[in-house]
Amino acid sequence: MHIGTNPKKFNITEEENTKLISEKFSELISKGDVICLHGNLGVGKTTFIKYLINNLQRKNNTEETEVASPTFSIVNEYLINDNLIYHYDLYRVKNIDELNNIGFLEDFNKSISLIEWPELLYKKIDNQ
């Protein structure tokens, strides 16, 4: 697993750009990748993930599914052929124990992880 070894920053202000960048990402990501998305409420983090997952589904000739924010469930899972994708929304998570209870970090090497509101993770890493 690579953590922060190749950080990139994208400033997306238009939905069409979000769609285009998600198409490029869908060609580059693979198992073991962790993508953290930052931004205020309503800036398009979930929209980016929706486009990304739907691009991966099309690329792998699988049916496109509805991609919704996991704000209340904390995580949504998508299986595309043999690729497991975890979509996390950590907005409501108060402490790292909540993540441990759902098995967060257990399968990072075997999946693609898309994380909205990853700031809690940074706090935990800084405190170690």
Regions found by a protein language model. Give the residues of each.
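Helix-rich effector regions associated with P-loop NTPase G domains
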Residues: 2-3, 56-59, 63-84, 90-128
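N-terminal pre-Walker A segment at the start of P-loop NTPase domains
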Residues: 2-24
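Hydrophobic anchor at the beta1->P-loop junction of P-loop NTPases
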Residues: 35-37
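The conserved Walker
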Residues: 41
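Conserved lysine of the Walker
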Residues: 45
